[in-house]
Amino acid sequence: MRNIIYFILSLLFSFASYALETINIEHGRADPTPIAVNKFNADNSAADVLGHDMVKVISNDLKLSGLFRPISAASFIEEKTGIEYKPLFAAWRQINASLLVNGEVKKLESGKFKISFILWDTLLEKQLAGEILEVPENLWRRAAHKIADKIYEKITGDAGYFDTKIVYVSESNSLPKIKRIALMDYDGANNKYLTNGKSLVLTPRFARSADKIFYVSYATKRRALVYEKDLKTGKESVVGDFPGISFAPRFSPDGRKAVMSIAQNGSTHIYEIDLATKRLHKLTDGFGINTSPSYSPDGKKIVYNSDRNGVPQLYIMNSDGSDVQRISFGGGSYAAPSWSPRGDYIAFTKITRGDGGKTFNIGIMKACPQDDENSERIITSGYLVESPCWSPNGRVIMFTKGWPSRAKAPGKNKIFAIDLTGHNEREIMTPADASDPEWSGVLN
């Protein structure tokens, strides 16, 4: 966000060691850290309304992470607000608040708002973080997400993921279903439709810059086109007409290339396209179905699924197609692998069969499974769970969750998120049914 100006308060804030133990978000479930997000002080009524809304967004971000427990304002003892005073720490400890956020909102002559916050450790009575932002009124929500990101990063040691977007397929609740590409904030706010619903659309993907998306659209039942849409200008163009394509491309970390699967002559293979020259390079061979390629964060490897040995399993190869290695060995069939932005894990869909029929699972495995033969871990299961994608910090997975048709009611799909530990599963609210989420990087 170029029009947000940062002023790091390096002379005022001491980032010394503090009493709170840094939250480790990989090792099981920890009790959420109690935090008080105090009323933001304001210099006029407009700033007061904006500050009130920001406190709600910041508190909601921290609560949704599962790592913080915002304390109700009804229990606050100290009545002072703002950043100009030192808190009465004993009063905050009395209500078991380990952390305290104080803030201030001022309206500037330019029409922008100056937003300041300080994060306090109430146990050691020290400032942990603080920042000043200047934002136009329409970007107040992003400013709130950025403050929550700073708090999350200071306490967990990992970058936050709140100032991000989700692109997904919106599905009407009536039959026949109308599918549209939609865009929203990570928490479901600011939902916006990007296509008109006149044609079938599938698998939206962000470009690396997050200001463009790519998706597949079926102009006819047999002809699939890959479209590029600029989110700033709204302009749309056809990237290519690839007969046999069923999923939108996934992009290399440098944004210069993309990988996709294309079906031809009874087989489906992985191809890499140079986005500048539009030249295709075939990466897999033989007979079989090879789909769902995803780059490693450094762009040197590609993970995909293939039924070359009879049942769909996961494989890794070099980005030029060499050195193919199978990485999944469990029962069931595997699909939709997605490499974590951190490079440590690969998320996947796994379908198993039992006496009760098919079960869908979302799992994760180490990207180098030879280091741990039992690295596979299922984190959620259901009638339909599929299409996992990662938060930009590699600590949360978003996915599609579906329910079957009952009586005269059609089945439905919704978007859910879950921590990589398998805890804190929650629905991301959307206006209609939703599927195929894709998570952007943190916005600029």
From Swiss-Prot:
GO cellular component terms listed in the entry, alphabetical order: periplasmic space
InterPro entries: 6-blade_b-propeller_TolB-like, PD40, Tol-Pal_TolB, TolB_N
Keywords annotated in UniProt: Cell cycle, Cell division, Periplasm, Signal
Pfam families: PD40, TolB_N
Tree of life domain: Bacteria
Compartment(s) of residence: Periplasm
Signal peptide residues on this chain, from the entry's feature table: 1-19
SUPFAM superfamilies named in the record: TolB, N-terminal domain, Tricorn protease N-terminal domain
Keyword flag Kinase: no
GO biological process, one term: cell division
Role played: Part of the Tol-Pal system, which plays a role in outer membrane invagination during cell division and is important for maintaining outer membrane integrity.
Record's subunit section: The Tol-Pal system is composed of five core proteins: the inner membrane proteins TolA, TolQ and TolR, the periplasmic protein TolB and the outer membrane protein Pal. They form a network linking the inner and outer membranes and the peptidoglycan layer.
UniProt record similarity statement: Belongs to the TolB family.
Name of this chain's protein: Tol-Pal system protein TolB
Species for this entry: Rickettsia massiliae (strain Mtu5)
